[in-house]
Structure formats: C-alpha cells, structure tokens
C-alpha cells in the first residue's frame, strides 16, 4: 500500500504555490445565498471582493451575475474603500470575461468599467481556486457570519446596507497574515490604489429591441411594456441592475421599468398605457390600467363620456410626471368625489400636496378646503 501511494503522489509541479499579493490588488468572486426580500424568498448572488494584503473583505448582494450587476456592485465596493484597486483578479466563470486557451475576451461593459476606474484585470486558470484563495475563503466566511440563518429584509437596498455594516464590523476585528490589525495594513493598500473618478459610472447594457403589436419588448427572456403607442417600433433598452429604460429614436424616453428576473408576467408602468387611452378613451373599459387605480376613480371615469375620460386620463398622466402615479390617482379621485371631471391644474396641485405628505398622511395639511371647493361649498373661491 505504501508503494502504491508513493507511486501516485503528486509530482513537484502539482502542489500549491504560496502567493504573495501586492498592496492595491483586489480579488473578486461570486457565491450563492437565499434571503427573503419584501416578503418574497429569493435566490441571490453574493459578489465578494477582497484586498488580500490586509485581508479586507467586502460583499454586495445582486440578483444576477450579468455584467451590469457586477459593475454596479464593484462600484459600490470601491465607494466603501474610497479608492479603486490597480489590479483585479477574477474567476474565469464571471460575466466580466472569458479566458480560452490563454486568450481573454472581456464584455464591452466591463471593459468600459475598467477604463473608467483605470485598473488592470487578470483571469485565473480554470479549476484553480488557489490562485485567488483570499476571496474563495471570504465567500464562505461572509456567508456564514452575515447570512445564516436565512435573513429577511424589506428591500435589496436594506439588505446591502446590512451587509456593508456587517463587513465593517468583521474587518474591524480582523488581522492580516503577519499579525497586524487589518486596518493598519489597509492604509498601505489605500496608498497604492487609485483615486475614484469624479463622475459615477453608469453600469448600463444597451440592447436593441423591437416592440410587438401590443407594445411589448423582450429583454433577457422577460417582457416589458413600452406601451401600445410604440407597437411594431424598433427601440433601445438600457439594462441596469435595478431598472430597464426604454428609449425611442433620438433618445426619447419611453419608459423606465423595474428590472425583473426569471419567469413572470410582463413588467409594466401604468403610465405607458395612458397615451393610447387618451387617443381611444372608450378602450378604458377593458384596459389593464383599471387594476392600478382606486375603485372609486375607475367608477367615476366609467360614468364619463369620451371627452371627459380623455381629459381625466390626460390630467393624471401630466400630474404623474411630478408627483407619481399613485398621488395623481388619489388627487383625481378627490376631484371625482367632488362631482367634477379632473383637469390638469386641479389634479396637479392636489397631487403635489399629496406627494409632499398632505392628503391622508398623518400630520399632513388639511385638504378639506379643496374638497369643499370641488363640491361648491366654498363661496369665496367662486
């Protein structure tokens, strides 16, 4: 047995070499974890970046490993350090790029990100985690210390704030390999790193799309509603970590919608339906926008003629630009309850006050005088 084991022992070229990392070098890798966000259980990605010299560990939660999510996450981590590394060592399996037979092909967005922060990149050999052992260990360490048991948060922003605080707490008690406090060695890294650019990097991936006859476009396998007014048109989708922006020719903004991942219904903004309804107000009776409005407002618009519907919908659309769709609908509902057809000036004024904390908000201004005016009860306002 001894002879058999010796005959199969690793040769001198098969062992692991101990690597020494210069200050200003960063390692990046991904891990997986589960969390409940806004009441929904999600499978998320943990983007981890380390500075091996001081053993400083940072992480960000993302919904995907796509290049726009990765660049946005790294930008957040660089912001925590207040500096950008000179060299980033990545896994060959990330969305940043691929190394095949020694030749690296990077994504266009990551190449732009590199140029913005002025760092160099290096890719590990396949199945060679020891080449970036610092971040490999950090993925498991941070997951065990910050994400067990399964955490629950109200939003992704709240989750990432918690991760940032947890990383700061763990780094405060960490020590680097020579026994010094991590914070002491971190100062050496920061002195070797580059200053952050004065302008933030917009991590956006632009994708040409074509709207179908309903005004729907498809991005990464998920449908987004540009609106019926844009049916059968060629459009441009700007895909960011949290949003999808749809542009028409000459950069005209069509819609900005929340980013969705995986399978599910089409993502829509009720306002994208309004232009088509203004042109064809009778279609309001069967429009999906009804589910986004208060029941009283829907009933009021149903009782209006075509001209009244057009006027009401246009006023909601215009007020939404400054105050948001929900505030505009609440304002229009007040006008309808007063027995009048919503108009631009009245809905805009009420919506602005509601959005600023008035209306039904506790401690907000009393809008009863507006209700009285709309019902004809305030004689001085006639």
Give short role names for the model-derived ranges.
Residues 60-87, 260-266:
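Active-site beta-loop-alpha junctions of metal-dependent nucleic acid enzymes
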Residues 90, 101, 121-143, 159:
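RNase H-like two-metal-ion nuclease catalytic core shared by retroviral integrases
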Residues 248-382:
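Protein C-terminal end segments and domain termini
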Residues 83-102:
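Acidic/histidine-rich, metal-coordinating catalytic segments
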Residues 103-121:
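Two-metal-ion acidic nuclease core segments, chiefly of the RNase H-like superfamily
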Residues 3-57, 65-69, 203-219:
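Mobile-element integrase/transposase regions
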Residues 139-241:
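Active-site-proximal acidic segments at structured loop/helix or strand boundaries
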């Amino acid at each position: 047995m001894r002879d058999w084991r010796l005959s199969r022992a690793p040769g001198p070229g098969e062992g692991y070499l101990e690597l020494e990392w210069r200050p200003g070098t960063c390692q990046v890798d991904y891990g997986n974890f589960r969390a409940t966000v806004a009441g929904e259980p999600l499978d998320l990605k943990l983007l981890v970046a380390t500075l091996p010299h001081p053993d400083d560990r940072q992480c960000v939660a993302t919904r995907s490993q796509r290049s726009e999510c990765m660049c946005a996450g790294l930008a957040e981590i660089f912001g925590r350090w207040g500096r950008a590394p000179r060299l980033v060592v990545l896994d060959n399996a990330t969305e940043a790029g691929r190394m095949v037979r020694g030749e690296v092909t990077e994504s266009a967005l990551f190449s732009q990100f590199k140029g913005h922060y002025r760092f160099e990149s290096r890719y590990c050999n396949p199945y060679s985690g020891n080449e970036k052992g610092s971040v490999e260990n950090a993925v498991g360490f941070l997951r065990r210390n910050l994400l067990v048991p399964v955490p629950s948060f109200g939003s992704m922003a709240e989750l990432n704030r918690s991760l940032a605080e947890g990383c700061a707490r763990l780094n405060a008690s960490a020590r680097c390999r020579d026994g010094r406090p991590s914070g002491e060695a971190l100062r050496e890294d920061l002195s070797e790193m580059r200053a952050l650019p004065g302008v933030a990097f917009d991590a956006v991936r632009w994708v040409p799309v074509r709207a179908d006859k309903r005004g729907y476009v498809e991005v990464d396998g998920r449908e987004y509603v540009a609106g019926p007014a844009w049916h059968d048109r060629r459009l441009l989708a700007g895909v960011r970590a949290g949003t999808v922006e749809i542009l028409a020719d000459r950069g005209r903004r069509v819609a900005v919608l929340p980013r969705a991942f995986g399978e599910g219904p089409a993502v829509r903004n009720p306002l994208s339906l309004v232009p088509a309804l203004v042109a064809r107000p009778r279609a309001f009776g069967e429009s999906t926008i009804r589910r986004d409005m208060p029941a009283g407002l829907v009933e009021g618009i149903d009782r209006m003629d075509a001209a009244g519907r057009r006027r009401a919908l246009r006023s909601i659309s215009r007020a939404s630009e400054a105050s948001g769709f929900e505030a505009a609908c609440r304002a229009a509902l007040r006008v309808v309850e007063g027995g009048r057809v919503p108009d631009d000036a009245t809905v805009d004024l009420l919506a602005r006050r509601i959005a600023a904390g008035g209306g039904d908000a506790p401690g907000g201004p009393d809008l009863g005088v507006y209700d009285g005016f709309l019902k004809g009860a305030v004689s001085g306002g006639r």
